[in-house]
């Protein structure tokens, strides 16, 4: 699975999966944070931080283990264990 970030003029990020063509919830860039070597987290509607890239071994316990995406609802929709992240 390949995940692409798209940042628009309103400072929002859309997450899209090129393999399925699905576009996930847009979030404000203030809710997306990077840390460590290879970690990226997104704050979901529930206020939880989840890892989009990296693993718990790289990221420690700052985010939920493994990788998740939000579908814009109050639930974390999809586990993405080996996501490749690219910024466009």
What annotation goes with each model-predicted range?
Residues 1-19:
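Mixed-charge, Lys/Arg-rich low-complexity intrinsically disordered regions
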Residues 75-88:
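Mixed-charge, Lys/Arg-enriched low-complexity segments
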Residues 27-76:
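Acidic, low-complexity, intrinsically disordered interaction modules
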Residues 16, 55, 85-88:
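Short stretches within intrinsically disordered, low-complexity N-terminal or propeptide regions
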Residues 16-30:
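Short coil-to-beta transition motif at edge beta-strands of beta-rich domains
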Residues 1-2, 20, 45, 81-82:
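Polar/charged alpha-helical tracts
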Residues 12, 38-40, 81:
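Conserved beta-strand residues within beta-sheet cores
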